[in-house]
Amino acid sequence: MSDQPDLFGTPTGAKAPHAIMPAGLPASWKEALAEEFAAPYFHALKDFLVEERRTHTVYPPAADVFNALRYTPLENVKVMILGQDPYHGPGQAHGLSFSVRPGVRIPPSLKNIYKELQSDIPGFTPPRHGYLKAWAEQGVLLLNAVLTVRAGEANSHAGKGWESFTDAVIRAVNNRPQRVVFVLWGAYARKKARLITAPHHVIIESAHPSPLSVTRFMGTRPFSRVNAALEEAGEAPIDWQLPAQVEE
């Protein structure tokens, strides 16, 4: 088993017969996902993405694909917010669902998330950025079901193998003995509820914060409900307030 810092970025020659491990993953994720990294579908996914990056622009950059797992070790996961696939505009995606890099315009769905936070969490002040790393560092796993996308083509990497991998991530989180709150927004994410079987976990579902469904999202108060569920289980709540100034 070897770390590969340019995994899914540049070809590495013949297909390896063993696990291919992205660089910088916490030990807990390496252990929990070892079978996935060795699975034939994962090697096929790597081959697909190497060719995609050779012929097209792919987001996020190869070094950022697994940031959700890097920033939030399995043993620290308290909340999971599941997205569908990365933003497909230039410079937006950096491996965390709903988040964008500092200096990038805040996308409409995230603007709506901030609006709901304002009404749900007393004192929340929307920052002028969309960089959600501070949540990830508190144990909020910001996971997309599909971790890459071709530039300008939403859902273009669906059905290529990512879903098998991220389902394994969800199952690993489901196996945690401590309570985890799963936040599932929209029909796509809500289908993943079937993977969440442990009775001590909590699922919070609603419409997606996209402008297309925002009227059914607003007023659902997911953030205070997350904290109430955590505190009920003796866990510290999430500080949803994001820093005013950030840098990568």
Swiss-Prot record:
GO terms for biological process: base-excision repair, AP site formation via deaminated base removal. It is found in: Cytoplasm. One of its GO terms (cellular component) is cytoplasm. Keywords: Cytoplasm, DNA damage, DNA repair, Hydrolase. It comes from the Bacteria. The keyword Cytoplasm applies. SUPFAM superfamilies: Uracil-DNA glycosylase-like. It catalyses: Hydrolyzes single-stranded DNA or mismatched double-stranded DNA and polynucleotides, releasing free uracil. CDD domains: UDG-F1-like. InterPro entries: UDG_fam1 (IPR002043), Uracil-DNA_glycosylase-like (IPR005122), Uracil-DNA_glycosylase-like_sf (IPR036895). Pfam families: UDG (PF03167). One of its GO terms (molecular function) is uracil DNA N-glycosylase activity. Its EC number is 3.2.2.27. The active site is at D85 (proton acceptor). Excises uracil residues from the DNA which can arise as a result of misincorporation of dUMP residues by DNA polymerase or due to deamination of cytosine. Belongs to the uracil-DNA glycosylase (UDG) superfamily. UNG family. This is Uracil-DNA glycosylase. The gene is ung.
